Every structure is written in C-alpha cells, then in structure tokens.
Amino acid sequence: MPIVSRKIRQLNAKAVTVSGLAAGAAFVAVLETDLRLTGRNVDDLMILGRPFTEDPSKARAVGMAIHVVNSLALASLYARLEGRLPGPGWVKGAIFANVENVILYPITRFEDVHPAIRTGQVDRYFNWPAFRQSVPRHIAFGAVLGVLYDRLRLG
C-alpha cells in the first residue's frame, strides 16, 4: 500500500527572516519597557545568556544572540502552522506565541539550577507575576510575526 505523502508548503525565506527578526525586536522592546515599569527583573536575555558567561553585560549580548536564533526558529515553525490557526495574522501570531509560552513556561520550575537566579542577578520566574509579565512580550512577538509574515509571504 503506498504511503500518502503531503506536499510540504515551501517556506518564503524572506518572509520568515524579516518577520522573525522584527518579532524578536518587538519582544525585546516590550521586555525592556516592562523591566522598567514593573521593577521586576525578569530578564529573558540574561536567562538565555548567563549560563555561558558570568559577566552580566556579556550575558545579555549572548542572550540576544540566542534570542535572535530562537526568533527565526519560531518564525519558521509559525510559517508551517499558521494556516491551521484562526483569525487574521496578528491573532494567529498572538495565539501561536502564547501557546509556545504556556508549553515552555513549566521549565521555569527548575529555576534553582540557573546561575543568574542563584546569584540574584534576575528575579525568580516560577510565579504568577513573572508569568503575567511574559504575556505582553509574547503578544507583541506574535502580533508582529503574524502581520509581517502575512504581508511578506503574499506580496
């Protein structure tokens, strides 16, 4: 019996790259804003980079590099899944990014092994205030990703 193959939709590399980078920038803009407004030091760039270096300024730079790679990877995944999500691009993107957040957030339960949390360089993540702080970041990421991806892949 033959195996039924699905035609895998060709990704538009420009749409994925531009929308992913712009979405990542939106995430960081909201992150920087909420760090200042809330007074809660829930810094994802430090969390990503600190395991690789002890210097806080270098940790944020390394974290930014990792964030860029993550943004591009998520944009690629979004491009594969967006046709299955309801609504206009910004809604699809916001749903996608917040589902990713909900799926991965339980990892923060193991925060005690993270060097930046152990040394007090960032606040604890495994709590409701920190989770709530992550939601606008993911809404911004997803909305920008969805809108730009739709516009760029179609035009």
Regions found by a protein language model. Name each.
Residues 1-155:
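Short amphipathic, positively biased membrane-proximal segments
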